[in-house]
Amino acid sequence: MPSNQTPLGALPARFRRQRLLIVGCGDVGQRVARLVPAPLRVMALTSSPENCAVLRAQGILPLQGNLDNAQSLRRLAGLATRMVHLAPPPTEGWSDPRTLALLRSLDRRAWPRSWVYGSTSGVYGDCHGAWVHESQPVTPFTPRAYRRVDAEKRLRWHGKGTGVRQGVRASILRIPGIYALDRYGGTPQERLRKGTP
């Protein structure tokens, strides 16, 4: 077996521990980390040096890196056995180069065995208030939704891969709305009560 595909059993005991990498460890990522069972080691990719102390205080190992700087992602290859990707795509364009950079960095070594990507229900487009189900075809309406569809397609393609990518379970969550409790303007319920957008 090539050295870049070393199974967990061939590693020293301290490296055999299951490891979860959260990419985009803001409010939701930190909530996910609090729900992770104890034997799993939680790491988080952060581009903010100021955020490192906050993450450490919660028992999360911070890793400095930036999805807009592919060179800073090189060390992520082979690091995690599981991954949760919650980082948003860039605010402009029709594709998601951040997810592409992350996927390319992981191609260098053994991939996480499972991966969860936080997408958006916006990939369904304007459904005019109708119910949406996950088997419904995507019909992105905005550039933001197109960027999310691009990331989903890339993740699915990589999940069906061979070699270091073989056997990766990729799950996509199409989240209808995420609102931190301390978000400017309040929660959706508070904004409805106030009559503000």
Whereabouts are the PLM-identified features?
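Hydrophobic, well-ordered beta-alpha structural blocks that scaffold small-molecule cofactor pockets
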Residues: 1-76, 85-86
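Short glycine-rich, flexible loops that bind phosphorylated cofactors or substrates
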Residues: 70, 91-93, 124
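NAD(P)-cofactor binding segment of oxidoreductase domains
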Residues: 76-116, 150, 154
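Conserved Rossmann-fold NAD(P)-dependent oxidoreductase catalytic core, especially the SDR/UDP-sugar
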Residues: 101-143
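Catalytic helix-loop patch of NAD(P)-dependent Rossmann-fold dehydrogenases
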Residues: 128-172
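NAD(P)-dependent short-chain dehydrogenase/reductase
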Residues: 166-197
